[in-house]
Amino acid sequence: MNFHDFRRHPGVCFHVLPDGQPHEHGHFSAAAHPGRRVIAVCGKGGVGKSALCALMTHALAHRTDTGRLLVIDADPALGLALALGIEPRHTIAGVRDELLAAATSGSAQAEQEIAQKLDYIVFESLMEYEDYAFLAMGRSRDLGCYCSVNDLLRDAIELLIKDFDCVLIDGEAGLEQINRQVIAAVDSLICVSDGSARAARTVETLWDMAAENSLVPHHSFFLVFNRQEEGVEPAALRSDVTPHVLGSIPQDPELTAFDKAGRPLTELSHNNPAFQAVNHIVAHLLEHS
């Protein structure tokens, strides 16, 4: 796979093609663009990450200080797409499969053509709406570890991200997938918990991983409690795990009904208690990050 070779230079990424000629584009990271805000949402499966991200999309899209908003569904299950009522035409996983097919075809011309138009192919996966743009990562047919292909795609995604003022990422339970496939660093990490003991253990694991991988400093690690019943205390965290709590979202029958019916959560009224809670959470986040 010749086109998987790279020559790294500060701020620049070169994709080395079979004929030895590098295809160049800028390599961007969150740290290089202090005016852009990158928010990632993680947590144990089933705690409501996608619902929170959908309502955050709704809230951010109606703020005057958000700027251009990009929403990335980085969970292979595409739960956020469903919560937003979106059917992705293309996914980054599809682009990855196309890259792998070209690399294994043995055709130097196919490899070169894919590498040269990679940024354009990734851009074509973007879906633009009135209030935001949407990008789906999806699930690749080939589950093998191809680090160089992942690096290629991450470079192209980071090139795309630079044109947005705010990026919201719905991730899987862990952090490594966001770091490996989407962007090298985030500004704010929101961990979602339903208050259960299992969710608390996931919060603790993510807290430890954030420090180990240097993905986000602890002062940028936030916690949101979802589906909270009045008077019920969430499970306690380890004494050394001290995320900033942004707020809690109440158990809401209207949101549950929307979810069961497959209706986009962005159609919830601004008077809905869950949306009002998320609107407050977004305001709180922007004040503290």
Where are these regions (language model features)?
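Conserved beta-strand scaffold positions in the cores of enzyme catalytic domains, especially
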Residues: 38, 71, 132-134, 245-248
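C-terminal lobe/tail of nucleotide-utilizing enzymes
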Residues: 2-24, 211-289
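Extreme N-terminal, non-catalytic leader segments
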Residues: 1-47, 55-68, 77-79
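P-loop/Walker-type NTP enzyme "switch/lid" segment
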Residues: 76-158, 260
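Conserved catalytic-core segment of NTP-binding enzymes
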Residues: 148-248, 257
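The start of beta-strands in P-loop NTPase/AAA+ ATPase cores
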Residues: 37-38, 68-70, 165, 221
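Short gly/ser/thr-rich secondary-structure transition/capping motifs
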Residues: 21-24, 114-119, 170-173, 206
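Hydrophobic positions on the alpha1 helix immediately C-terminal to the Walker A/P-loop
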Residues: 52
